């Protein structure tokens, strides 16, 4: 196995709020290897986006971040800001959530893509523009020459998503983070975006954040399931998404329409005062006495397959 | 609320309350009757007259104290009228929507193109009204702005789930507007009240400064006007010129601080990153 | 599409103007006593009846009210706004002259206020909560709370009297009587009024811009810009500013229109012979035609400002077309 491209060790992210400290990430360890797509699955509020923002240090200035995030051996969390800026966009690209509001409404789409190119690759405006048009073509936007001069509000949701992808790929980064790229899209467009990512993911490592299990199944080699700021299952996507070890993952799959659409009872726990012991225990069908008092560790339950559950962590 | 915010709030409320107290207790605090002639005109401050006397030998200190009444009255009365009217119309317009809303907004649109200050000037010149009338006029003319503000908030409230739910229970419109919409709109109206009060006080004093306004009432604006007209600048009659101005500025500041502090609390603009 | 909208706009503006004229007309009718009493208070008692009759005829008081109203309306549209009592010349003429002088101080002050307000407000909003922001915000609140007449007086006293840097008022020295108007002299006189006007309006622009920037700074596309690797200053300059300035355009154009009457205090204190000073004089002498004229000019200016704002906005915001009900 090659050395990991991205190593996250002991990541803790907390937001101080008037009501207390929100522990959005609580001791996360994760590795992402070259040319793999890691799917990160979780509900809203589980801490998925926080993870991606933490990698690029795009969180609010008063956020508390502890731990290490090593990219190609360098700890990103300890880099000076101007070094970090060189990493953003060039070495690590990100496709942010909410394509509609993530594009600046007063600049053309071409300008916004070209901006990333001029910044990191120092090309002149005209060459950058050409490259932008090429990128629009690569993400399968029809008539890219004309569309490059268009404004974001003139694009449909799916096309805006593609523009964001083009922008993220502008400098050909070796690591891409995609945050819920299929959210809010209709079934047809979803499939198109997933197809696009199949191509895009071939040449790089991708952290694919989603709550869409289909997308994860189609694109990810491995998946990590996140719940209440913790990774609770990690493994090969084929295995995890068909024979999940953790009750939560099982619940997620069962809540899919084709599997019976049985929702998981209860709601997402508070990140300020998470439940004691196993964080999923309040909602877990198999919860036993020790689940409420013991906090399970992430243990191996199969080859390369890990789960954080008392079922596997008892003595 | 942060500590500094609390200090500002306390300080501004303290100042405002002090002014109110002075206004109410004026007859007891002021050493002289504000219109009475007491000693030599244009005399500098001394033991008898802490702030000296003006051209009519009236005690400036007493006039300053009595002037608080006019100022506070114009400000608070005018603001009250403006906010009550503005909120009322805003709620009706925003809640009912449709034709009523269109009609009201058209009227407001046209009304807002009429310059309020010149109109006020002309009205007060020709009717020489007392300060109550001035306050009412300002309140009326100043209510238009508030309507827009309140209405936009009501628009989003009117389609909120809890309103639809209450309607489904069969509640009357007036009940919904009074019981559910009004409380939600009160914070905004409250802030508007504070700022309007400040605004109207400044205009009211301004009118006095221009020589319009109620001559029977002691008015800081008039004091400043008379002072500068009697050569206070050249003659260095600082005790006449400066105190009224400071008095206005202080209450204006207090109200502004109060308004901004409250506004910041109501509209948190810090956007928390979605987790 | 655009044409229909423009016509609708013009019609609304026409309505607004008519309503202002109507209000003036009603005010005349409601005047305690009648028109003549207002005009010729003292002479009335002594005026022989045929003079009174001639007067009534000239001012059309001997016709039915409705006819008077229509004549009044027509006059208003033709620019026939009557004669000033003080100056004995057509109202429009005297307003025109004085308006120019108001512009001399108003335009530089407003231009500077807009530039400064936008720049400082943007920076303040971007760095919300920082020491600079808090200091600026408190400073601006302080200045804005000071009534404009008080501010003007203080500036006059401090700079004009005590420091003796600038003249105490007027727009020219008496030397102009012999050697004509010297632009430099006018400029020297204009400094303090411009300073006062500037201080007063910069607070408004600052506040609006800061608010606008606060909202813009929290938008998603700012995070996108950071994710691309841009530095903070570039993001502020390129991405944030343009978006934050959009709502400013409407605000600023409307503000400009209201400035005319706002200058009444400043002009009175500095004895600057502009529209504000004219208004003051008209009030003092109860020159009704002049006052009507000033009201109408103001209404016109607000209407023009509104239409300008409506037409400019679509040019700078690519999302908006003319007639989108902005």
Report the location of each language-model feature:
Chain A
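P-loop NTP-binding/switch modules centered on Walker-like glycine-rich loops
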Residues: 185-260
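Conserved ABC transporter NBD signature motif
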Residues: 64-75
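ABC ATPase NBD coupling module
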Residues: 76-93, 111, 119, 239-244, ...
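Catalytic Walker B motif of ABC-type/P-loop ATPase nucleotide-binding domains
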Residues: 176-179
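Short catalytic/signature loops enriched in Gly
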Residues: 4, 145-146, 234-315
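A short, proline-enriched helix->beta-strand linker immediately N-terminal to the Walker B motif
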Residues: 170-174, 203
């Amino acid at each position: 196995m090659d050395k990991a491209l991205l190593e996250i060790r002991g990541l803790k992210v907390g937001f101080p709020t008037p009501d207390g400290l929100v522990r959005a990430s609580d001791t996360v360890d994760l590795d992402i290897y070259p040319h793999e797509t890691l799917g990160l699955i979780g509900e809203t509020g589980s801490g998925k986006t926080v993870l991606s923002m933490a990698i690029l240090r795009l969180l609010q200035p008063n956020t508390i971040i502890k731990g290490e995030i090593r990219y190609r051996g360098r700890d990103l969390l300890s880099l000076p800001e101007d070094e970090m800026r060189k990493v953003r966009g060039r070495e690590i690209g990100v496709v942010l959530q909410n394509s509609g509001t993530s594009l600046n409404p007063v600049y053309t789409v071409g300008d916004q893509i070209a901006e990333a190119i001029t910044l990191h690759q120092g090309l002149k405006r005209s060459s950058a523009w050409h490259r932008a048009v090429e990128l629009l073509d690569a993400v399968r936007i029809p008539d890219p020459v004309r569309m490059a001069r268009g404004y974001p509000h003139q694009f449909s949701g799916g096309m805006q998503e593609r523009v964001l992808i083009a922008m993220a790929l502008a400098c050909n980064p070796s690591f891409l983070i995609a945050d819920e790229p299929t959210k809010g899209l209709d079934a047809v467009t979803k499939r198109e975006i997933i197809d696009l990512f199949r191509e895009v993911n071939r040449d790089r490592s991708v952290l694919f954040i989603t709550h869409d299990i289909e997308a994860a199944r189609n694109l990810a080699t491995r998946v990590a399931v996140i719940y209440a700021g913790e990774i609770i299952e990690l493994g090969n996507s084929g295995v995890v998404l068909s024979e999940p070890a953790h009750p939560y993952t099982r619940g997620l799959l069962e809540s899919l329409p084709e599997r019976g659409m049985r929702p998981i009872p209860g709601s997402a726990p508070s990140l300020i005062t998470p439940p004691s012991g196993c964080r999923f225990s309040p909602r877990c069908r198999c919860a036993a006495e020790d689940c409420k008092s013991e906090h399970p560790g992430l243990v191996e339950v199969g080859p390369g397959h890990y789960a954080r559950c008392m079922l596997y962590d008892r003595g | 609320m942060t500590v500094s915010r609390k200090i500002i709030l306390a300080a501004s409320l303290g100042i405002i309350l002090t002014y109110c107290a002075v206004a109410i207790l004026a007859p007891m605090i002021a050493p002289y009757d504000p219109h009475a002639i007491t000693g030599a005109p244009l005399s500098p401050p001394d033991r008898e007259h802490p702030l000296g006397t003006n051209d009519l030998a009236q005690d400036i200190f007493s006039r300053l104290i009595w002037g608080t009444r006019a100022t506070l009255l114009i400000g608070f009365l005018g603001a009250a009228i403006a906010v009550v009217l503005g909120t009322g119309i805003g709620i009706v317009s925003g809640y009912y929507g449709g034709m009523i809303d269109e009609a009201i907004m058209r009227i407001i649109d046209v009304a807002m193109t009429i310059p309020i200050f010149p109109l006020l000037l002309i009205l007060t010149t020709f009717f020489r009204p007392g300060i109550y009338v001035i306050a009412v006029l300002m309140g009326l003319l100043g209510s238009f702005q508030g309507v827009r503000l309140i209405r936009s908030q009501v628009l989003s409230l009117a389609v909120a789930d809890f309103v639809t739910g209450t309607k489904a229970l069969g509640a009357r419109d007036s009940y919904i507007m009074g019981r559910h919409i009004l409380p939600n709109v009160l914070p905004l109206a409250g802030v508007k009240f504070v700022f309007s009060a400040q605004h109207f006080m400044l205009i009211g004093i301004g009118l006095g400064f221009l020589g319009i306004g109620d001559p029977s009432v002691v008015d800081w604006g008039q004091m400043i006007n008379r002072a500068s007209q009697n050569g206070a600048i050249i003659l260095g009659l600082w005790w006449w010129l400066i105190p009224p101005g400071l008095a206005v500025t202080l209450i204006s500041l207090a109200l502004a601080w109060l308004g901004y502090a409250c506004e910041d609390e109501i509209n948190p603009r810090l956007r928390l990153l979605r987790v | 599409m655009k044409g229909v909208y423009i016509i609708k706009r013009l019609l609304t503006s026409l309505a607004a103007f008519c309503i202002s004229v109507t209000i003036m007309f009603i005010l005349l009718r409601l005047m305690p006593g009648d028109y003549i009493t207002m005009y010729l208070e003292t002479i009335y008692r002594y005026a022989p009846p045929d003079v009174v009759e001639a007067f009534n005829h000239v001012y059309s008081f001997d016709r039915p009210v409705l006819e008077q109203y229509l004549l009044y309306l027509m006059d208003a549209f033709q620019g026939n706004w009557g004669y000033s009592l003080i100056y004995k010349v057509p109202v429009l003429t005297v307003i025109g002259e004085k308006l120019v002088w108001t512009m001399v101080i108003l335009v530089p002050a407003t231009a500077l206020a807009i530039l400064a307000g936008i720049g400082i407000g943007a920076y303040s909003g971007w760095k919300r909560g920082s020491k600079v922001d808090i200091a600026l915000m408190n400073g601006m609140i302080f200045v804005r709370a000071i009534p404009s007449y008080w501010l003007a007086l203080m500036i006059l006293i401090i700079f004009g009297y005590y420091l003796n840097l600038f003249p105490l008022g007027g727009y020219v020295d008496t030397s102009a009587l012999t050697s004509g108007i010297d632009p430099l002299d006018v400029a020297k006189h204009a400094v303090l009024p411009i300073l006062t006007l500037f201080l007063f309006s910069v607070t408004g622009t600052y506040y609006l811009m800061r608010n606008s920037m606060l909202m813009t700074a929290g938008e998603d596309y700012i995070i996108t810009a950071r994710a691309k690797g841009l530095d903070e200053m570039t993001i502020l300059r390129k991405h944030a500013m343009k978006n934050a300035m959009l709502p400013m355009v409407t605000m600023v154009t409307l503000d400009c229109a209201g400035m005319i009457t706002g200058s009444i205090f400043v002009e009175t204190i500095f004895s600057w012979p502009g529209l504000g000073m004219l208004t003051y004089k008209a009030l003092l002498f109860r020159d009704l035609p002049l006052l009507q004229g000033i009201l109408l000019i103001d209404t016109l200016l607000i209407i023009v400002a509104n239409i300008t704002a409506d037409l400019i906005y679509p040019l700078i915001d690519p999302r908006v077309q003319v007639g989108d009900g902005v």
